[in-house]
Amino acid sequence: MNKVSLLHEGKAKKVFLTDNSDLVIQEFKDDATAFNAKKKGSIQNKGVVNNAISCTLFTFLGENGIPTHYVEQLSDRDMLCKHLDIIKVEVVVRNVAAGSLVRRYGFKEGFVLETPIIELYLKDDDLDDPLMNESHAVALGLASYEELDRLKELAAAINTLLRSFFADRKLNLVDFKLEFGRHNGTILLGDEISPDTCRFWDLDSGEKMDKDRFRFDMGGVEDAYSEVQRRVLEL
């Protein structure tokens, strides 16, 4: 499968059209951004690590009944995917209070939520990806109420699967972001699942093992990403 032309370049990936109109190639970059690209940098080998993690997790989810855009891993940085009509709604699932949840509502960081919180955000960098509800999404023409119910249903199922998967690897899935798209009338999970899109804390030590290490200049970013990769791929 060959890259024909660049369809889109985002903060962490390039998406290429292929000679099959139904398929695209995602190329993972080493570029790193935080705070909606207000902070920029690079994490050595990040693209390779995130591609390997994402391919493994998409395979796992697909084997457990979650429809995804993943087709196959083409190389250390390239993933073959189904061509989606992206729904401009980011779905965030929170199991433990961290990040903006702490800032907005006054939770203590690390507070374990009795029930996971599912949030919707408008996918728009210029507006800083604002929090929104279903009525906003429908009014903006992004999705129907039925589609939004499906997004939340899938997000909850994915959370159940991934929490167990990561707990087996001594990682606490604190929260994570999902993106979805339409493909031939079906909603599929898209984008990636990696330390760029998830908060991971070591279950024993509580050490942060995700992009927060880049956001807040904690150091050890490459080591944390590589350790997550090692644990994801080890079993």
Swiss-Prot record:
The keyword Cytoplasm does not apply. It catalyses: 5-amino-1-(5-phospho-D-ribosyl)imidazole-4-carboxylate + L-aspartate + ATP = (2S)-2-[5-amino-1-(5-phospho-beta-D-ribosyl)imidazole-4-carboxamido]succinate + ADP + phosphate + 2 H(+). It comes from the Bacteria. Its EC number is 6.3.2.6. GO terms for biological process: 'de novo' IMP biosynthetic process; cobalamin biosynthetic process. GO terms for molecular function: ATP binding; phosphoribosylaminoimidazolesuccinocarboxamide synthase activity. Pfam families: SAICAR_synt. Keywords: ATP-binding, Ligase, Nucleotide-binding, Purine biosynthesis. Disulfide bonds: none annotated. The keyword ATP-binding applies. Pathway: Purine metabolism; IMP biosynthesis via de novo pathway; 5-amino-1-(5-phospho-D-ribosyl)imidazole-4-carboxamide from 5-amino-1-(5-phospho-D-ribosyl)imidazole-4-carboxylate: step 1/2. Belongs to the SAICAR synthetase family. HAMAP family: SAICAR_synth. This is Phosphoribosylaminoimidazole-succinocarboxamide synthase. The lineage of its organism: Bacteria, Pseudomonadati, Chlorobiota, Chlorobiia, Chlorobiales.
